[in-house]
Amino acid sequence: MFTFFITTLIILASERTIQGEDLTNCEFTNTACAKLQQNFKGTYVQNLCTCDEGTTCSSSWSSDSDLQSITQGKDQYQFCYTIRTQKSKNCSSTEYAYKELTRTSIATNKKEISHNYYCYCPPESKYVYDKSEYSSTTHYEQNTRVFKCQTYPTCHEHEICQTAVERTDSYLVSKNCKCTGX
């Protein structure tokens, strides 16, 4: 018999959330402007960058027919533009699905983070870290983390299926493996 476990981690020190004027403009059409997550505490919205003229993208959960979002389980990524070509293409196990680019100004230490999607992970899959790439110029340091799709493994007996992180302003759940049975 398998048991369903959820571990909750409570973070007392709140991490600063980037909002409004601190957000950079979304650089590419495949850059996610927001990440939404549905869980039993509601829908959590993390704005990632702004669309044209500094407008934030949708903070509402979209239907599967929406061409400006990608749904991955209980997470949804919103985009400023139609992403039909990327959305309709499922990733193979060897393709890069997603890149997270962090560019840090050497002069000001200000970070710009962009989340770029290239294809869609199939249902019951997750984004898994594959590798990092680092480069620098006289003005910026740049770190790119690359992710691929991987099918969730089946949980073993007494293995933790999900991990929850609670902060003062958010509650996020990460699925670790596929639970079977009760």
From Swiss-Prot:
Keywords annotated in UniProt: Disulfide bond, Secreted, Signal, Toxin
Post-translational modification: Contains 7 disulfide bonds.
Leader sequence residues: 1-20
Location of the protein in the cell: Secreted
Tissue: Expressed by the venom gland.
Superkingdom of this protein's organism: Eukaryota
MF (Gene Ontology): toxin activity
Protein name: U-scoloptoxin(11)-Sm2a
